[in-house]
Amino acid sequence: MKRLARTLLTGAAGVALALAVVSPALAEPNPIDYTSPPEVDGQQVMKIGHSVNMEWSSHTAILKRFAELVAIYTRNEIVGEIYPGAQLGGEPEMVQQTRQGVLQVTLPATNNLAALAPSLNVFILPYIATSTAEVNHLQDELTPTLVPRVIEEAGVRIVGWENSGWRAFFYKADEPIERPEDLADLKMRVPPNPIMIASYKAWGGNPTPLAWSELYNALQQGVVEGGDNPVTDVMGMKFDEVINRMTKFHYTILTHPIVVSERWFQGLSEDHKAAVLRAGEEATAYIRWWQPIDEAKWWAQAEEAGVEITEITDESEWIEKARAIWPDYYKDIGDDGEALANEALAIIEEFKRQQ
């Protein structure tokens, strides 16, 4: 994460900062709980909004950690207030509030933020990476290029990353999804992202763009028969009550950048900027340790709930069909979309060679 750390510190007026991250298993207990930090003179509130209402979601885990670290590194001069469960609006609304400085921090899905910051669509290209290690490395290496672009496009600054896990098919059907043609008879919900919609069409599926907040009722009423999300979301939102199957594959991982209002950030002192950037860096390292442990728990719960789980062991047909759409969507990344996609591929190939 060294290159990411260097970039996140850009704009901190050369403040030297030690970014060594203590393993969460060995770290001292946090002296501050984000819900009740001690008051100090001139204390300012950092409003944090996100869309998930699960107490122990990876959203909650990383944002609590981030808020605690900001409080610690600013000596309680900046304290966080977390508003979960879309209390402040959906993700598009919260991104708008963040770019305006009304909200200081939010955690949108990359595919949702890409509506304002198209450069991030490079992460949405299907099968651009096929392992969590590749995704983490790509984030670390490509973020230096993306930070200034996203600031210009959306008015928000990436200070860290949360990965919720690989998107898996969840659905109600008599037979499992194993090959692309198995999607033909299923109405599947997709986020309103053009690349994700095109991926389903390439597989011969029937994508139905639908807001996340509408999904449970749509499944219950048969408007759609499934979709794809990490198992944490599927089980946390109790979709197992209205679906009976899940299929594991690796076409894209659900990622969420921690973004702060650039307007707010530029109004901070240099010490406070450095503290926010350090907190984002360390919260990223923390969630990368925490998330796989949590995800394994949710898969076990899905199995216990009676969900039939299938794993696609040979994804070559899925990969071939999905990657064929890439050239059509370089423009959705930007004028240099192809070059940015090639840079991402080169980063991953170099990473593979080093393993």
Regions found by a protein language model. Name each.
Residues 11-20:
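Bacterial N-terminal signal peptides
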Residues 7, 20, 321-324:
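Short, solvent-exposed linear motifs at loop/edge-of-secondary-structure regions
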Residues 1-10:
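Bacterial Sec-dependent N-terminal signal peptides
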Residues 5, 56-57, 141, 145:
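Secondary-structure junction/capping motif
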Residues 137-151:
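Signature of the catalytic double-stranded beta-helix
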Residues 13, 26-134, 151-153, 157-355:
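N-terminal secretory/targeting leader peptides
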Residues 10, 140-141, 193:
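Polar helix-capping/helix-linker motif
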